[in-house]
Amino acid sequence: MKGLIARFIAGFALLLWAWDMVFPWQQLMQAEENRYNQIQQRKILRVGMVNHPLSYFIGAEGTAGIEYELAKSFANYLDVRLDIKTFDNSEQLFSALKDNKVDIAAAGLLYQPELSKQFQIGSAYYSASWQVVYKKGSNRPYKLSELEGDLIIPAGSAVLPILQRLKEDNPKLSWQTTNQFTQEELLLQVAEGKIPYTVGISVDISAAQHIRPNIAVGFDLTDEAPVLWYLPNSSYSELQAAVLDFMNHANETGLISRIEEKYFNHLAHFDYVDIQSYLKAIKLVLPKYQSLFEKYRGDLEWQMLAAIAYQESHWDPNATSPTGVRGMMMLTRDTAERMKITDRTSAEQSIRAGSEYLHMLMRQIPETVPKEDRIWYGLAAYNMGFGHLLDVRRLTRQLGGNPDNWLDVKKNLPLLAEKRHYSGLKYGYARGFEAFQYVENIRRYYSSIINHQRVEEQQIQNNEEQPSVPQEISKESDSTLKE
């Protein structure tokens, strides 16, 4: 009997030990598996982000960015409210995800094997790579061994685990970190020659080159990797299933394509000379006419009206083309008479008439076209005529596309110059390929003005707070050297 009791006690103790070992895991699993239910119960989706010019920012028109638009759509998909929580860097963001302070980490984060062991991942929505950058005209680095101590990165950057892994095969690799500058600010410091090298994500570098064209890529630090959301870790998660379902839905409905078109497509074309000339004009010429663009902007942002005028005339009120169009907005004589202006070379008259004419065209665009795309339809009509815009909408429908989807319409613009297509259209031949490029150029110019202003304002603020480059990121400083 004593032996039986002893065995029972021993067995019970073993059971308690096993329960103690398993219970925390069960608790964790319970919490993770219920994360989706928690979101539904509180009716709030908490998404962690880092302020960033492509991912998440608050601009003149309100909150925007790739991650914001995706997260907002996901919250709508779940029928809950979106709560954005911002962090200074990726390290803080992942710490918050681990501590259950956010439900999703969304900050233009590339897939990393180390992180996938700690967190669940969602579907990829674009891909990018880490690259080493230097100032155009200075010594270009070609390999890791040339970076010794001269590489500056932000503290808490997502690239740190990558550098630590690379150091295993490259023992001389070293870098310095700074708490005082963001990744974008370090890219700009490279452009100004204040620091020799930094790293950035390829799409961020492309965006930065449109405001600082002397930023150049030395070499790829990594291969291209998917950009995705990170979720709390567990062996199974309803939240992960919901994210995967949403991303499939976003692909099928064209949401991902529309977001890529909005934030990425205008970055594909990079002309060093053109951008240099444009940035010079922003500094020297634009201030003369900015008040007029603001005065006559109507429903547009004044920066958009300025971008149109630059595409038309490079902000030259006396510009003339061989076809007879003249002035800041390059108006035809017929359009000038229609808009009741007497002097096409008057900057004010031309800007006013051009804006009013564009607004008139946009009012004719069907209400079924989404609000954010109406400007692109209007610009295409401004360039080639409203009749040809109607034609390309008809052609898009004939070819199985959606005439209310700018992505579908714009790819068919060049077809207006092909006889097999224009011969069956009401308004016939049009130089649709020019209209396509016209809209793309304006998108690029508009983005550059917005980003140039944002960077200038940030630099003024930084100069007031920090008049010189802090010692913490100077080459002489050893206090921040990280291995």
From Swiss-Prot:
GO terms for cellular component: cell outer membrane. The N-terminal domain does not have lytic activity and probably modulates enzymatic activity. The C-terminal domain is the catalytic active domain. Its EC number is 4.2.2.n1. Residues 269-483 are annotated as: LT domain. Residues 473-483 have a biased composition (Basic and acidic residues). Residues 1-18 form the signal peptide. Murein-degrading enzyme that degrades murein glycan strands and insoluble, high-molecular weight murein sacculi, with the concomitant formation of a 1,6-anhydromuramoyl product. Lytic transglycosylases (LTs) play an integral role in the metabolism of the peptidoglycan (PG) sacculus. Their lytic action creates space within the PG sacculus to allow for its expansion as well as for the insertion of various structures such as secretion systems and flagella. PROSITE patterns: TRANSGLYCOSYLASE (PS00922). Residues 458-483 are annotated as: Disordered. The gene is mltF. This is Membrane-bound lytic murein transglycosylase F. It is found in: Cell outer membrane. It holds the Pfam family SLT. It catalyses: Exolytic cleavage of the (1->4)-beta-glycosidic linkage between N-acetylmuramic acid (MurNAc) and N-acetylglucosamine (GlcNAc) residues in peptidoglycan, from either the reducing or the non-reducing ends of the peptidoglycan chains, with concomitant formation of a 1,6-anhydrobond in the MurNAc residue. In the N-terminal section; belongs to the bacterial solute-binding protein 3 family. Keywords: Cell outer membrane, Cell wall biogenesis/degradation, Lyase, Membrane, Signal. HAMAP family: MltF (MF_02016). GO terms for biological process: cell wall macromolecule catabolic process; cell wall organization; peptidoglycan catabolic process. GO terms for molecular function: peptidoglycan lytic transglycosylase activity. It is a peripheral membrane protein. InterPro entries: Lysozyme-like_dom_sf, MltF, Solute-binding_3/MltF_N, Transglyc_AS, Transglycosylase_SLT_dom_1. The active site is at E312. Residues 19-267 are annotated as: Non-LT domain.
